[in-house]
Amino acid sequence: MPKRRDIETILVIGSGPIVIGQAAEFDYAGTQACLALKEEGYKVILVNSNPATIMTDTEIADKVYMEPLTLDFVARIIRKERPDAILPTLGGQTGLNLAVELAKAGVLEECGVEILGTKLEAIEKAEDREQFRALMNELGEPVPESAIIHSLEEAYAFVEQIGYPVIVRPAFTLGGTGGGICTNEEELVEIVSTGLKLSPVHQCLLERSIAGYKEIEYEVMRDANDNAIVVCNMENIDPVGIHTGDSIVVAPSQTLSDREYQLLRNASLKIIRALGIEGGCNVQLALDPDSFRYYVIEVNPRVSRSSALASKATGYPIAKLAAKIAVGLTLDEMINPVTGKTYACFEPALDYVVTKIPRFPFDKFESANRRLGTQMKATGEVMAIGRTFEESLLKAVRSLEIGVHHLELNEAKTAADDVMEKRIRKAGDERLFYIAEALRRGVTVETLHEWSQIDRFFLHKIQNIIEMETVLKNHPGDLDVLKKAKGLGFSDAAIAALWNKTERDIYAVRRQRGIMPVYKMVDTCAAEFTSETPYYYSTYEEENESIVTEKPSVIVLGSGPIRIGQGIEFDYATVHCVWAIKQAGYEAIIINNNPETVSTDFSTSDKLYFEPLTAEDVMHVIDLEQPIGVIVQFGGQTAINLAAELEARGVRLLGTTLEDLDRAEDRDKFEQALSELGIPKPAGKTAVSVEEAVAIAEEIGYPVLVRPSYVLGGRAMEIVYNRGELLHYMEHAVRVNPQHPVLVDRYITGKEVEVDAIADGETVVIPGIMEHIERAGVHSGDSIAVYPPQTLSAEVIDKIADYTIRLARGLHIVGLLNIQFVVSGSDVYVLEVNPRSSRTVPFLSKITGVPMANLATKAILGTKLAEMGYETGVCPVRPGVYVKVPVFSFAKLRNVDISLGPEMKSTGEVIGKDVTFEKALYKGLVASGIHIQPHGAVLLTVADKDKEEAVELARRFADIGYQLLATNGTAETLKAAGIPVTVVNKIHSASPNILDVIRQGKAQVVINTLTKGKQPESDGFRIRREAVENGIPCLTSLDTARAMLQVLESMTFSTTAMTEGLVRS
């Protein structure tokens, strides 16, 4: 069927902010889809609230709306633009849910908009647990015994029939939110109550637990002519019971017999046909390891995390082709862009093994529950490609950036045997390392299989790795053994440790003896046809398929897996850097390992190397390609951390020099630079011992901000108010020594201001200045940022610009620079300088119209900013007000304190833009998922230091008709100020206490500021968690509360009686 000519304009719904369960894979899918539709000649309108994405760039769609993804706002856009059709299957769960809402509210019918791709009925059949089960029964496809429940009573009734364990899956939620496995009544009550609350339709599916079965996924595609193919089948190494987003996954499956593979393949194709899906779809199945019994677990009728992985694993662009199927094209008339010859209806074949390992945020959340289950906890993932499973696994392990270069983890090495067994029986994020350790201690594969339910095949492969360690230990310096170890995927660092050599020694020996990797192409057809795509992975074989061209090249280092503190913003900058290199006439080569992102789409760069971002793996590419240089500014801390080692190995770094990077990152050199430039910073010093830290704090006076040197996303930063707290921090948060000094700074309360600038050694361009709503002390990534600044005087703005220009020139910055200032009165202090691309670059680029990464890259390559038409100073302010609001994934992470501080906790961001600050902030808050109620009750419980300030806020809440609830201490303060308030009992008092008030939904907002004491048992912690579990906005900073009040005040008319406020003379 040729493409449809009866539609012209298509609205694409994006997936909104990055949260756990819905990350960069949808930016990749959405970008591909918009470009594919434009390629076919349609007009594309995109709506998405996430400014950090490539897809919200103006060149991706014909019109881009960065507005909240809510029924109200999207309906307005539809009424204004009158699109012919809407494509919701590329916006994750958010896009699907929104399409269902728009249809139910009658908006689509009213405006004559049809849904493209998979039809609404099919979406509902796959997503609604009852309809799905009915369809499976009709098809004769087995599903686990289950019941749909709407209350706890119904849950009890089901469990009486089939017994524990049972799995709870809430309907229409994302990444298994609210779900879990229950093994007893207490867990049932807790998980079912949460699940019902979090499901938008208040229903859960309870099913017999088949935990322990093999979890297999098929990524399938179908068109309107009923052509259907399997793009990729994948096997989860972790058995059923762990969310597939948290599982280690291999493609193609390794342990299925041909009969099992065909059995599950036929089931998947039968299901996608019965559902009538048009586009991409993901089918998850459970296979009994001991028989041919299987169950269908679920179907995602949309592009998903797994389809991004399948696209990158096979090279087959699922989202691009799904978008074209949606407008009527069929698989047998579309050419596969990878080979440029074969049609899209050929199933990809793989002659390599792909391994995906999730990246978890537990380095940021010490207290989080690390147990893995049906609710997703990973923020991102890495992928690696090798010729054997061992090679692929070890490459993926060293891509994770968790401080390991091999299957070796200190905690596992030092663990007692019983602890080790527990860690293997109950899966956590580090189970793989404990399994390796158990094998080293002589535990058998059989025992490990019994403990973990992981297939013996994978355990034997890990044993091969452990056996090779022994061979290496026994044959130091043996070149044949070295060759074999490299073939299994061992890193130079791992071999060096076993041979008591340095990593560079091993590299030198290999180079001398020609034990170097070759690069193979990812071509979708196991080398059967020649391929058009320059997409490579390394392995130790004979023939190299990556041909070096005559054109001078530049290598860009990507930012690796998404984690808190280093998100999609860095991928955005990487992609723009690559595009700018191409524009400048060089060959752009990228090295990265994140399967979710646009940067690892083979059509982004001239050449893509899917490799770990370690000095060794990057050097291999450099040795082959011989580029004119390497750019490290855009890959976040990942790339910056490789700079010193690369330069030591003779690599030319482009842009700001290593010496200048070091002057910005090294505390003492930085202070010296500041004093030479005459720029003030808060008093502070570096400590290399606990005693020294105490002495510095006493000298400059409390409160002080303490943090380790060289960190991203404020890891292990804290504000301490006295000696006791400082000692607690020094003992628990950091290991201080001369190699790892700790910075101790005077903490200044003031406004925080952030600036990004581009410099070329002479000209310094400042696209814009952002003012933070939360005062200094809240991590910049967790603050609400406003452009243009709302409360800064002209004098302060001039000072900020002056200091920025002086710093950029003084530190000889070539490329990007990010500075954070604190403003106290008319004094401006520098808090920190990052000589690289930052988290705010995409937001600022979009709202100011200054293509920052593009200009920075061209400056790095030698073009002067003045030649590009820019001059030193702050760019003219754009009309309108723009706010960047952080988005958190607290509902997914139990046991994590949501209070804001110097350590970053948000996973994503949204934008709000309008003509006034209040309207923009309203949109930003709504887009971030905060429901703003024009009336109701506010619950206040604030620390003593904040009570004075809370009085003014409480009075304003009362003025707009909010009822005030407060705990005793706060209530006393309010009563004394003459404000009417209802006292709520503290946690340990009689019911109804504060937790009951929150649970029963009697408060619309909770304002709770931190009393010191981070322990999970503290009252404040329990109040904040209770608010999150019940979906009530909980503000832990009075600044955020004040901003929200401004929004509420602007929405309500004031009602004052005529006598009030009249002054009698």
Swiss-Prot record:
Mn(2+) 3 binds at residues 820, 832. Residues 402-546 are annotated as: Oligomerization domain. Large subunit of the glutamine-dependent carbamoyl phosphate synthetase (CPSase). CPSase catalyzes the formation of carbamoyl phosphate from the ammonia moiety of glutamine, carbonate, and phosphate donated by ATP, constituting the first step of 2 biosynthetic pathways, one leading to arginine and/or urea and the other to pyrimidine nucleotides. Mn(2+) 2 binds at residues 298, 300. It comes from the Bacteria. The gene is carB. Mg(2+) 1 binds at residues 284, 298. PROSITE patterns: ATP_GRASP, CPSASE_1, CPSASE_2, MGS. Residues 930-1065 form the MGS-like domain. Pathway: Amino-acid biosynthesis; L-arginine biosynthesis; carbamoyl phosphate from bicarbonate: step 1/1; Pyrimidine metabolism; UMP biosynthesis via de novo pathway; (S)-dihydroorotate from bicarbonate: step 1/3. Residues 133-327, 671-861 form the ATP-grasp domain. Composed of two chains; the small (or glutamine) chain promotes the hydrolysis of glutamine to ammonia, which is used by the large (or ammonia) chain to synthesize carbamoyl phosphate. Tetramer of heterodimers (alpha,beta)4. The large subunit is composed of 2 ATP-grasp domains that are involved in binding the 2 ATP molecules needed for carbamoyl phosphate synthesis. The N-terminal ATP-grasp domain (referred to as the carboxyphosphate synthetic component) catalyzes the ATP-dependent phosphorylation of hydrogencarbonate to carboxyphosphate and the subsequent nucleophilic attack by ammonia to form a carbamate intermediate. This is Carbamoyl phosphate synthase large chain. The keyword Glycoprotein does not apply. Residues 547-929 are annotated as: Carbamoyl phosphate synthetic domain. ATP 1 binds at residues 129, 169, 175-176, 208, 210, 215, 241-243, 284, 298. The lineage of its organism: Bacteria, Bacillati, Bacillota, Bacilli, Bacillales. The keyword Transmembrane does not apply. Residues 1-401 are annotated as: Carboxyphosphate synthetic domain. ATP 2 binds at residues 707, 746, 748, 752, 777-780, 820, 832. Mn(2+) 1 binds at residues 284, 298. NCBIfam families: CPSaseII_lrg, PRK05294.1, PRK12815.1.
